[in-house]
A protein has these predicted regions:
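Acidic, proline/glycine-rich low-complexity IDRs
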Residues: 1-214
Length: 214
């Protein structure tokens, strides 16, 4: 599954710039998620690495297997987002994406997504949507990112633990939705759409072939 992580992108070593901060976050990640399987290293100055952690998404109390990966950024939270004072939201965040295969395409997309708040002087929070002009990854017709928060216990604990310079760090899960689903959220509100996800047993792992629920 990790064959598309090509050297020098695939590396278990933490490079020198900002290594202390990145290493501290990685230690928290690995405490909850286990040892990482790979890292897509960011050679840039505003460093945002993407770690891949293997996971069986079937709960321990259930039978079967649903193997995939947790992709998690490391470095987005180094910069505060431009959160309006009246919003009362966290000013720092890291992004998480549940995927079947930890491909370089998806990991690079996730890293780019983590740069958007600083580049565009904006912010991401629970329920925010980011429409794109075209599907951001191959194999899907969906063009809009939707940010939610984790419902899986280890991922929630990461969010409860992370902090930078006294600021709590929010973990936002990445989802892709259809144009019609996007319009439903704008028309009926986020809660109505979340109810629709529950009714359709929305899969934890990103499925590019998922059909629109609207």
């Amino acid at each position: 599954m990790l064959s598309l992580f090509k050297k020098p992108l695939l590396n278990r070593e933490i490079p020198a710039p900002a290594s202390d901060f990145h290493a501290r976050r990685l230690a928290i990640y690995e405490r909850e998620l286990g040892e990482r399987d790979a890292t897509l290293l960011d050679p840039g100055y505003s460093r945002i690495d993407v770690h891949a952690f293997a996971r069986d998404f079937v709960p321990d109390c259930e039978e079967g297997s649903d193997e995939g990966y947790v992709l998690l950024t490391n470095g987005m939270s180094e910069q505060r987002m431009a959160v309006p004072p009246q919003a009362g939201a966290n000013r720092r965040a890291e992004l998480m994406w549940y995927v079947r295969e930890a491909t370089a395409e998806i990991s690079t997309t996730l890293r780019w997504l983590a740069t958007v708040p600083s580049i565009d002087d904006t912010w991401f929070g629970f329920g925010h949507r980011l429409p794109m002009p075209a599907p951001p990854v191959a194999g899907t017709d969906f063009k809009t990112f939707l940010f939610l928060t984790p419902i899986i216990a280890p991922d929630q604990r990461i969010a409860e633990t992370l902090a930078v310079a006294g600021d709590p760090v929010e973990i936002l899960t990445v989802n892709l939705i259809s144009d019609r689903e996007y319009e439903m959220i704008k028309r009926d509100g986020l809660d109505a759409f979340l109810d629709l996800l529950d009714e359709n047993d929305y899969p934890a792992i990103f499925d590019p072939a998922r059909k629109s629920y609207v």
